[in-house]
Amino acid sequence: MSLGLAGSLQAQLALEIVIQSLENCVLGPNQEKSLSVQNRVQDFQGASLLVCAREVIASNLSRPETPAPLQVPEMASLLSLQEENQLLQQELSRVEDLLAQSRAERDELAIKYNAVNERLEQAVRLETGELEAQEPRGLVRQSVELRRQLQEEQSSYRRKLQAYQEGQQRQAQLVQRLQAKILQYKKQCSELEKQLMDRSTELEQQRLRDTEHSQDLDSALLRLEEEQQRSASLAQVNAMLREQLDQANLANQALSEDIRKVTSDWTRSCKELEQREAVWRREEESFNTYFSSEHSRLLRLWRQVMGLRRQASEVKMGTERDLLQLGGELVRTSRAVQELGLGLSASLHRAESKAEAALEKQKLLQAQLEEQLQAKLLREKDLAQLQVQSDLDKADLSARVTELALSVEHLQNQNSEKDQVNRTLSDKLEALESLRLQEQTTLDTEDGEGLQQTLRDLAQAALSDTESGVQLSSSERTADTSDGSLRGFSGQRTPTPPRHSPGRGRSPRRGLSPACSDSSTLTLIHSALHKRQLQVQDMRGRYEASQELLGSVRKQLSDSEGERRGLEEQLQRLRDQTAASAQAQEDAQREAQRLRSANELLSREKGNLTHSLQVTQQQAKELRQELEKLQAAQEELKRQHNQLEDAQEDSVQEGARARRELERSHRQLEQLEVKRSGLTKELVEVREALSCAILQRDVLQTEKAEVAEALTKAEAGRAQLELSLTKLRAEEASLRDSLSKMSALNESLAQDKLELNRLIAQLEEEKVALLGRQQQAEHATTMAVEKQELLEQLRLEQEVERQGLQGSLCVAEQAREALEQQILVLRSERSHLQEQLAQLSRQLSGRDQELEQALRESQRQVEALERAAREKEAMAKERAGLAVKLAAAEREGRTLSEEAIRLRLEKEALESSLFDVQRQLAQLEARREQLEADSQALLLAKETLTGELAGLRQQVTSTEEKAALDKELMTQKLVQAEREAQASLREQRAAHEEDLQRLQHEKEAAWRELQAERAQLQGQLQQEREELLARMEAEKEELSKEIAALQQERDEGLLLAESEKQQALSLKESEKTALSEKLMGTRHSLAAISLEMERQKRDAQSRQEQDRNTLNALTSELRDLRAQLEEATAAHAQTVKELEERTGNLGRQREACMREAEELRTQLRVLEDTRDGLRRELLEAQRKGRDSQDSSEAHRQEASELRRSLSEGAKEREALRRSNEELRSAVKKAESERISLKLANEDKEQKLALLEEARVSVAKEAGELRASLQEVERSRLEARRELQELRRQMKTLDSDNGRLGRELADLQGRLALGERTEKESRREALGLRQRLLKGESSLEALKQELQGSQRKLQEQEAEFRARERGLLGSLEEARGAEKRLLDSARSLELRLEAVRAETSELGLRLSAAEGRAQGLEVELARVEAQRRVAEAQLGGLRSALRRGLGLGRVSSSPAREAPAGGSGDGLSSPSPLEYSPRSQPPSPGLIASPAPPDLDPEAVRDALRDFLQELRSAQRERDELKVQTSTLSQQLVEMEAERDHAASRAKQLQKAVAESEEAWRSADRRLSGAQAELALQEESVRRSKRECRATLDQMAVLERSLQATESELRASQEKVSKMKATEAKLESDKRRLKEVLDASESRSIKLELQRRALEGELQRSRLGLGDREAHAQALQDRVDSLQRQVADSEVKAGTLQLTVERLSGALAKVEESEGNLRSKVQSLTDALTQSSASLSSTQDKNLHLQKALSTCEHDRQVLQERLDAARQALSEARRQSSSLGEQVQTLRGELASLELQRGDAEGQLQQLQQALRQRQEGEAMALRSVQKLQEERRLLQERLGSLQRALAQLEAEKRDLERSALQFDKDRVALRKTLDKVEREKLRSHEDTLRLNAERGRLDRTLTGAELDLAEAQQQIQHLEAQVDVALEGNHNPVQPEAGEQQLELQQEVERLRSAQVQTERTLEARERAHRQRVSGLEEQVSTLKAQLHQELRRSSASVSLPPGTPEK
């Protein structure tokens, strides 16, 4: 008995320990199962101790399995809400960890309790088993005692549960304290935000300082411009230069037109020739194929032809007589050819191109004829097989002989008649073809006779062939005559083959007849054809050589003439530059006169040479003379360059330079002698060639004499040029003296001289390159001389051929007549060309004056060019002769333009010295007079040089032998110079590339520094955020300690959230997809940004490659110039084109460079303005950037100075204003040609600026978010205070305050999550918080808005009118802002910069506003979702209030019916606390539950579905109205007149609104006694609901009226169906809006849950509205008035349409200027910010109204007044709001209001739906207005030109990329945090897994131990069984009970162990399931985040790939 009592006491102690542990588990710090226990406690009255304990344990053990899976969805839902807020995520995760630990401990305790319970039962059973035999009654008493003790324990447990309830109340107090701490935390957050605002203000101040700095820079630029404008003389010279340059351009254009004409004629003739060649080739191929088939027959025919040749030799005697006659005729023809040569030399351009084309064609024709003759010879070898074809061959040969003669004469005489000749030839060929056909028919009919006739025809052909061949040469009386005639025959045949090939294709069918038997005739034919073949071959070779020589000579003449013209132009330019260096007008005029005299001398010499050029050799002489003239002119220019260059050198170096100049003069004289010797040699060779070319050597002798006379004239001219050279050198000496005198004044230029010395070194390298080019030109001249020699030899051969052509004298006479006519034409052309040359000389003289003034402006650069020219002259004197200088003059002239382009880049160092040089112009004026005196001395020196040249002429014979050696030396020098030129080019290219690389590196370094500083700033901001978050986390950790006490309430909240979890799961999936889309879009944006960076790098590299290619192009141009001398006729056209293009390109390049400089300035200013926001944080980077920019600016200033030298300085601003479009078009050229790297740098800088702007905007938005966060926190503080006050007022809710606090905490967590999400998405944050504020404020504002729904409709209509007025006002403000911007522009560059900056910024702002609108729509959807969640929480609060008012004291069923009525959600499953979602509420006396049957969740869901459908339809209608906007905007002009009427109507409506507000106030005054009538609140609420149903009916009527208005709008849309083309543009917007609507619908489910939770709190507020029943009639009256107002709103819809048309008229005015549109968009953006600010203030007021409503009736009145004021402020804000997002926000706010009022009155919901429709209509109107603004902006941007559009688009794209990059960075940071959180969760889960594994290991070890014990027990059992058996055998009766008892104990112990193992395994499995679910949830979140990142990346990439011109919707 004592053992039983001891066991029972031990069992009681164990039970007490278990109960204590259960209390610690249940009522301890975790407190998770209080409600469950509490629910179960009521059933414990009649149960036994064990049963109650088992039930408690079972309930606590069965529930962990449910929370574990429920925890995961809850956790998953929280994680799904993580994109809205991540601030409380860690806290929640820690709470969940604590819950998991508490559950684990609870499970362990439950297992232990079960074990203890089982042991207790076993002990009781054992005790009963032991004592049942002895003390059954004592055992019963003990069991009774134990039961009593258990009951006492149960009662104590119930007392503890009561204590737990009290603890729950204390927890409510803890919630309050927690809220106070949260408020403190919010205050700290607000302080931190204030600090951030201070930081943002500091950033703004820094930006202002940066703007001041930029203004200082602008002022510095202005001062620089003032310094540049100080030179008034320079401006005048610029004007004069512009005029003269225009004249020169006109002259150049005239010349270029002439050259184009000549070139076009030549190209056309070449094309025709090529076509004919192609035809001839085809014919030749056909002939080859045909005659190859007849080769065998020709072999047979050849034997017969031999006989024909013998007969042909007899004909030679007759042909010799004809040859004598032809000799005389040939003499006459040679004279005519000489006259023709004179005419050709005079024509030069036009005639030469035609003659060259003709000669080329003749050469090609002859070559082809010769090839055809060869083919014919091959065919003649097969004449044995062509017996049938012999008659056709005869006819063909005879026809071709005549045609050849005609074609030769036509080609030589008249190129213009070649087409006619070809036609005649084609006619003849056709005739021959017809003859062939006829003969073919005759041969088919008469074969035998045909063979005989064939032999006779062959004999006749041979005879005729020999006759033609005899005429080849008088000296060759044998086979050559027939050969030449045959060649002549075949030569005429060339044009004919295309027409005869078909006939020939049929000729093989005639080759079947037998051979003729007349062998003598055949032998004669064979011999004649053989001789003819030899003659044809000889004549063909000679004629080809002669034609090639003629073509090459003429090509050389044309090329040299083109080069001469280019050199003349360049010489004139250089002369102008030389004259400008002195800048003395009188001296410049003298120089111009001298240059003109030189030009006239050149023209006179050319005229003398044209008279002397009686033969083609004289053309070469004239070319050489002209080249000498050009060389002399170039030498003069070089001497002038030497003068100006010497003017810049130090006085110390002048003596050495003078000595070097003397040495150079001697070397130059030697070179002149060498050249003279070479020229004499060439003249001798030419004379010899002419003597060979003329029949009687005496003709060539006379021509030699004439050439000698021309040479003497050229030498005389050269002597004069030598004298001028000496004179210029004397002038140089005088300039040196004057410069030595002025050296004291030039001390200030020492630094500039050092820089110029560096430039000199560079120019020397360039000089080496130019000398190489000169040597190449010299080599080309030598080649030309050799070609001339070949030409002379070929002419000799041509004379022989001409002698052979005497046989065709009759035909030649006819051709001669045509030739004489052509000679007349050529003479006329020659005279015309001479006139053109005279005009060219006049134009060149005019260019002298023009370029003199131009060179005065660019004095500094001219001096550098002169220095380079002087050095080049020195090198030219040392290494080359006059011929080399002549060829190099063209190269130098060409490179001078290239050097000018390069010097533009080098002009940075020259710009400062330019002004000093300009100050020295007066001094140079005086020196100019000295130079004039020195020029006289130079004239004397020139005369002395003429004497010396006379002596040199005597040494010509001796120097001719040295010419060959000199040529070799020259070739070596040319090679060396070419190497030096290549080396200099490589060095220059390397230097240029180094400069480019240096600039690129500097830019990249600046970019990297800016990026680093930007990253540092972002890191600082992120660090601040992280610090803030760390502080928040610290405070959260502090709060988590108190939250641990609230975990029991959390468990209750989890039970309450069970109804929300299904919706949360669906929302989780939708938001997961959204987040995955965001992630994908962000990744795409990152990929796009990386691609953009790579593209920009590639662009920079490509631009570097372009620069390198530019240098390579220069080298290739040199190679092309070398090839021009070798490419003959093609080179002439190319040279002419190049000269022409260079002449035009020089001016265009100057203008383009000018535009480039201005554009670069503007771009620099744009960069400086855009960097204003960065300059505090990026001062170092700015200094580096300014260094690079200063260097680039110096280049730009240098380029601008060079361009200003070619532009009008005084008219620069006006010209630039007029040429805005030209500048834009020039920017494209400049970008592709000059500033590609600069643009790349500027793009990078712009990106930096955009990043900084985005950073500033982010900072601003952060400040705004902080302010909004403060407001949210303030509103939350007020809401919490109001909740506390409401709790104090309603003491019956104390038992449910804990849950209310938990729901508020959940709401706060969601709001915090929303805030975190707002930080992650920049645009969405402000709208989200505003809507959160609005949602929170609307919780209390809806209490008074039931009667204000009517006024809201009126306010909406007034808002539309206010929006119209706001738009008009914003338009006016935009105009004013544009005017101010235009007035504030200081110069054209700044204005252009401002315009572009404003374009880009306003485009960004517009896109940002549109993006904000979209973001606001998205955030509105989110706010609506959160609002619905808040409403769900209000439902829970309302149920709590109902239970607090007495429902909880009646029964559990009613206590749960109230929340079912208040917060039942059709989408959620009922919670354990909500038993009947459709049960009726209790009596009003017990509870003020306002949940009538009309608040059925299903009805609510149906209403919500209807509302969502209506919302979709309204949005569709809004989309349709968007299309109408574009049409209605056109009617805005007409609606201007109706706007006043609408305003009056608005006033009336405002009066009605005031009346309704007065009624509202009266209603509020009547609400004063509502607080004393709490018992009537439920009935009043029911009456209000009936009232709401009535209002719903009225709202249906209003909806129908609105549908009528919408039908009217659709009718108006049909009227403007022409504008529906813009629907395609709106499709994307519609899709986005649909997506937003889908997202909003998905979130609406979530917000519905929140809304139902908040309906409980709203129910409390409804308790104070008991007297609303008395005002039902007033509401009915107001509903009627609302219907009338809706009818009025239909009229107002028309007025709105008119207003939209007026707005379109106002917007039409905006088209007048682009700035107006930009300022409009800016004002709209400002209005958006103002409206958001006003909305936030309105929300604050609404919060105050909430507080006032919760306190007392007086506070309600104050709250009503504040609400009125808030509504007025809201109306003002709505008037100011013009953006789509704010209107959507307002509409969605109204939607939120309607959703919150749904539980109160369904009628109000319909009214608010009607209001929503109206708001959507207003939104559609606003969208149309915004769309119209966008369209107007696009139109204005299109007017700015293609460049500005491209720039704006690129800037918009860049800004989009930057914004997307920033957004991506933020998203990436958030995602990283999320991923870090997920990783931490994974780590926690891993740790849990490890812990569980450890526990499982421990349990396994325990299990193994238990198994071992079991095994031991089994062994003991077996042992005991054995003992029992033994005992049974020995002593059966006494041992049996003990063995049975032991066996029973062992079995019980085994069962207990097994049950413990099973329970342990179950627990472990439950934990593992929970862990797996948690891990799977985390993995799903990770995958969702990754998917969203990918989607965000795709979206960003898609947004980047959109057309830049497309505005963002």
Swiss-Prot record:
Compartments, record wording: Cytoplasm, Cytoskeleton, Microtubule organizing center, Centrosome, Centriole; Cytoplasm, Cytoskeleton, Cilium basal body; Cytoplasm, Cytoskeleton, Microtubule organizing center, Centrosome
UniProt entry tagged with the keyword Coiled coil: yes
Tissue/organ expression: Highest expression detected in photoreceptor cells of retina. Expressed at lower levels in brain, trachea and kidney. Detected in all major ciliated epithelia. During embryonic development, enriched along the apical domains of neuroepithelium in brain ventricular zone, in primordia of retinal pigment epithelia and in neural retina.
Similarity comment text for this entry: Belongs to the rootletin family.
GO terms assigned for molecular function: actin binding; kinesin binding; structural constituent of cytoskeleton; structural molecule activity
Disrupted-gene phenotype: Mice have no ciliary rootlets in ciliated cells.
Organism: Mus musculus
Subunit structure, interactors included: Homomer. Interacts with KLC3, NEK2 and the N-terminus of CEP250. Interacts with CEP44.
Gene behind the chain: Crocc
Name the UniProt record assigns to this protein: Rootletin
Post-translational modification: Phosphorylated by NEK2 which may regulate its association with centrosomes.
Regions of compositional bias (Low complexity) in chain numbering: 577-586
Polar residues compositional bias, start-end: 463-484
